[in-house]
């Protein structure tokens, strides 16, 4: 999305712009963790050659697994599992709840990492500059957590990694921020269509094999709700009223009734959704038993691939 499509159309001046340091820190952390993962993986030492040779052998122990094993140019699934990938059996039966958090800091390969971090920079910096690191950090972490819960409920026979849930949470928060702060935007329809298009593209990519679309959906829904809670802004005209020196000027509410309703409904939904999801997960529930067609949301079979 171009920056001009995301610009705020405020009718007053003097908006505070925060310095974005958390988003670059998140990117550095993800890249650093990936380097540690590749060092631990040590393809030349652990690969037997049954699936082919290591890729980029010049990197030695940092070289990638054979493409037949990992087309994203990354480590083996066993290395990811050892270092904190989301694995239903280990989370529920092994009591390793921390995997619901650690999985969002791991990536399947350098392609996966670059794509996610590029989007995190685009969306994260813009949001952090406008709303500060605390609110954006909360949205990122809680959305990633929500994505992990939904993924673990539906994908119980495979492992999952990636910041996609947290990233989609940022996108969802941007969408709800547009809706709840509708009166202070210029080019409302253009911005709305741009958000919906980008989100649709990401969800469509999630229909491909090897991509965890349940993490996408869980993160998106969580972030969408959190946007109504954490990113609510004063309605158009309130700032002018507050700064007005006119005696007897009619009082104006800081937020409009619709914003309060959205705040309350979103708060109930996010608390209830995360609570119910955790209860179902640790009760050993399989989401596919309650939704027979939901597996199609993660991978849609075509003549080009099977699921």
From Swiss-Prot:
Recorded topology in the membrane: Multi-pass membrane protein
Superkingdom: Eukaryota
Gene3D superfamilies: Rhomboid-like
Annotated GO CC locations: mitochondrial membrane
GO MF entries: serine-type endopeptidase activity
Transit peptide: 1-62
Major localization listed first in the record, in broad terms: mitochondrion
Subcellular localization, as worded in the UniProt entry: Mitochondrion membrane
InterPro entries recorded: Peptidase_S54_rhomboid-like (IPR002610), Peptidase_S54_rhomboid_dom (IPR022764), Rhomboid-like_sf (IPR035952)
Residues forming the catalytic site: 164, 216
Swiss-Prot/TrEMBL keywords: Hydrolase, Membrane, Mitochondrion, Protease, Serine protease, Transit peptide, Transmembrane, Transmembrane helix
Disulphide bonds in the chain: none
One Pfam assignment: Rhomboid
Transit peptide is among the record's keywords: yes
Assigned EC number: 3.4.21.105
Protein name: RHOMBOID-like protein 6, mitochondrial
Organism annotation: Arabidopsis thaliana (Mouse-ear cress)
């Amino acid at each position: 999305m171009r920056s001009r499509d995301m610009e705020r159309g405020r009718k007053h001046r003097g908006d505070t712009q925060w310095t974005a340091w958390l988003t670059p820190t998140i990117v550095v952390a993800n890249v650093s963790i990936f380097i540690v993962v590749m060092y631990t993986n040590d393809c030349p030492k652990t690969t037997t050659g049954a699936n082919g040779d290591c890729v980029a052998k010049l990197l030695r122990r940092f070289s990638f697994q054979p493409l037949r094993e990992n087309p994203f140019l990354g480590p083996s699934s066993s290395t990811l599992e050892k270092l904190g990938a989301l694995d239903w059996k280990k989370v529920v039966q092994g009591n390793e709840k921390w995997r619901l958090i650690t999985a969002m800091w791991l990536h399947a390969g350098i392609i996966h990492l670059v794509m996610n971090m590029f989007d995190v920079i685009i969306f994260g910096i813009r949001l952090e500059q406008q709303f500060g690191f605390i609110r954006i950090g909360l949205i990122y972490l809680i959305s990633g957590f929500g994505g992990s819960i939904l993924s673990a409920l539906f994908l119980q026979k495979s492992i999952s990694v990636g910041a996609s849930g947290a990233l989609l949470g940022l996108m969802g928060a941007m969408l709800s921020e547009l809706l709840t702060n509708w009166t202070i935007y210029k080019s409302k329809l253009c911005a709305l269509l741009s958000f919906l298009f980008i989100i649709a593209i990401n969800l469509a990519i999630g229909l491909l094999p090897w991509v965890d679309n349940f993490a996408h959906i869980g993160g998106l829904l969580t972030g969408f709700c959190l946007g109504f809670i954490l990113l609510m802004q004063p309605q158009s005209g309130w700032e002018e009223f507050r700064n007005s020196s006119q005696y007897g000027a009619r009082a104006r509410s800081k937020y409009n009734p619709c914003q309060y309703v959205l705040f309350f409904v979103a708060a109930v939904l996010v608390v209830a959704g995360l609570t119910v999801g955790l209860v179902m997960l640790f009760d050993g529930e399989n989401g596919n038993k309650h939704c027979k067609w939901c597996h199609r949301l993660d991978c849609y079979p075509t003549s080009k691939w099977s699921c």
